[in-house]
């Protein structure tokens, strides 16, 4: 069963194939990031704050190419809050001013109040630079795997172990 490991050349080929898969995935991610002009072109909805528009586990595709274009009320955006790692998906409900320095107020469709409590300390509004991208497409529930992996860390270990086992046992 592990006879493939006895041959160093075959083991090296398997290791290189695994590295090729990882580097291809990374290059695809970076390519999509450049095309969409977004550091995170694909995000997963982590909470129910945007229901019924988006459910927990929906996979969202972002577009940020029109940085100079006006952001409009009603647009669903993903933004980062200074000091927090997790991006937030919410709708723009109010806009004050025009251009890149316009002040934007967001709110989740399923939330009672706006997002001022979520913003960084001393921040009352968002500006265009806080926005990672606007949602232009989504796939329902596909991102639920990400949620399961973050809520159950042992699943990561099991999946990585299975992937490693497949690479080791793979025959050319």
UniProtKB/Swiss-Prot annotation:
Active site: 49 (charge relay system), 90 (charge relay system), 115 (charge relay system)
Glycosylation site list: 111
Enzyme class, UniProt record, top EC level: hydrolase
Gene3D superfamilies found in the cross-reference section: Umud Fragment, subunit A
GO BP, sorted A to Z: protein targeting to ER; signal peptide processing
Stretches assigned to the Cytoplasmic side: 1-14
Residues on Lumenal side: 36-172
Keywords attached to this entry: Endoplasmic reticulum, Glycoprotein, Hydrolase, Membrane, Protease, Signal-anchor, Transmembrane, Transmembrane helix
CDD domains: S26_SPase_I
Subcellular location, record wording: Endoplasmic reticulum membrane
EC number from the UniProt entry: 3.4.21.89
Residues spanning the membrane: 15-35
Cellular component GO terms, alphabetical: signal peptidase complex
UniProt catalytic activity: Cleavage of hydrophobic, N-terminal signal or leader sequences from secreted and periplasmic proteins
Bilayer topology: Single-pass type II membrane protein
Region annotation (C-terminal short (CTS) helix) ranges: 158-169
Domain of life: Eukaryota
Single annotated GO MF: peptidase activity
Family: Belongs to the peptidase S26B family.
Function: Catalytic component of the signal peptidase complex (SPC) which catalyzes the cleavage of N-terminal signal sequences from nascent proteins as they are translocated into the lumen of the endoplasmic reticulum. Specifically cleaves N-terminal signal peptides that contain a hydrophobic alpha-helix (h-region) shorter than 18-20 amino acids.
Subunit structure: Component of the signal peptidase complex (SPC) composed of a catalytic subunit SEC11 and three accessory subunits SPC1, SPC2 and SPC3. The complex induces a local thinning of the ER membrane which is used to measure the length of the signal peptide (SP) h-region of protein substrates. This ensures the selectivity of the complex towards h-regions shorter than 18-20 amino acids. SPC associates with the translocon complex.
Domain notes: The C-terminal short (CTS) helix is essential for catalytic activity. It may be accommodated as a transmembrane helix in the thinned membrane environment of the complex, similarly to the signal peptide in the complex substrates.
Protein name, entry field: Signal peptidase complex catalytic subunit sec11
Organism: Neurospora crassa (strain ATCC 24698 / 74-OR23-1A / CBS 708.71 / DSM 1257 / FGSC 987)
């Amino acid at each position: 069963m592990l006879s493939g490991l006895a041959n160093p050349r075959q083991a090296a080929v398997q290791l290189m194939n695994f590295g090729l898969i990882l580097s291809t995935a990374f290059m695809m991610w970076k390519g999509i990031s450049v095309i969409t002009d977004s550091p995170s072109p694909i995000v997963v909805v982590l909470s129910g704050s945007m229901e019924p528009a988006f459910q927990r586990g929906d996979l969202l595709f972002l577009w940020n190419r029109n940085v100079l274009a006006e952001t409009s009320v009603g647009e669903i955006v993903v933004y980062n809050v200074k000091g927090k790692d997790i991006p937030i998906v919410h709708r723009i409900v109010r806009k004050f001013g025009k251009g890149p320095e316009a002040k934007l107020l967001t709110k989740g469709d399923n939330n009672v109040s706006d997002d001022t409590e979520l913003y960084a300390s001393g921040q009352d509004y968002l500006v265009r630079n806080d926005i990672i991208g606007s949602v232009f497409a989504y796939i329902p529930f596909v991102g639920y795997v990400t949620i399961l992996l973050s809520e159950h860390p042992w699943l990561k270990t099991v999946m990585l172990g299975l992937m490693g086992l497949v690479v080791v046992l793979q025959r050319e």
